[in-house]
A protein has these predicted regions:
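Carboxylate- and glycine-rich phosphate/diphosphate-binding segment that chelates Mg2+/Mn2+
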Residues: 2-98
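Short helix-capping/linker segments at secondary-structure and domain boundaries
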Residues: 44-50, 98-100, 132-139, 180
């Protein structure tokens, strides 16, 4: 996948209408939801992250964790679809200012070479990259990811926060039937 960017490609207005998502198949809903989660998590732990991008990304993570499964299970769930449309937009507001990370760097060629949907490739790679990045200065942020995903982080150490965040991502991915392996 080649990315081309030009200021003339940036729209003046973006219309995000959850009603247009009602007919999306479950697999597409799951994959695009995990793509949005990957956007939020990658840009939250990227070295360029700062207080404003963190605010957007934590809210997006929370909204996705609370609504993605419902949107996958029932495509006509108005509240879940609306929350997911807002969450993906909020995640985009954050990552457009700080960038993404190695998950997307690897997901693009994975999708191209193995015909893997982009969101599925992201979902497969995200937990492993999170574990790898846990050795970085971003490690203290993982406990906030876990908390945003609904984990009770009271009294957790940094290492426990990392594990909880990774496990929460894996659990959400599995709950919406994202393949857990490439084959």
């Amino acid at each position: 996948k080649m990315v081309c960017v030009d200021p003339n490609d940036i729209p003046a207005v973006a219309i995000v209408d959850p009603e247009l998502m009602y007919s999306m198949p479950k697999g597409l809903t799951a994959a695009t939801g995990m793509d949005a989660l990957t956007h939020a998590i990658e840009s939250y732990i990227t070295p360029g992250a700062w207080v404003m991008s963190d605010m957007f990304e934590l809210k997006a993570i929370e909204m996705i964790a609370q609504n993605l499964k419902a949107a996958v299970d029932n495509g006509k769930d108005v509240a879940a679809r609306e929350a997911m449309s807002q969450a993906q937009y909020i995640a985009g507001m954050g990552f457009s200012n700080v960038g993404l990370g190695i998950v997307h760097s690897m997901a693009h060629p994975l999708g191209a070479f193995y015909d893997t949907p982009h969101g599925v490739a992201n979902a497969l790679l995200l937990p492993y990259v999170m574990e790898y990045n846990a050795e970085s200065p971003a490690a203290p942020k993982y406990i906030h990811i876990a908390k945003a995903m609904g984990v009770d982080t009271t009294g957790m150490s940094e290492a426990e926060g990392v594990k909880a965040a990774v496990e929460a991502v894996k659990a959400l991915s599995a709950s919406i039937n994202i393949p857990q392996k490439l084959h």
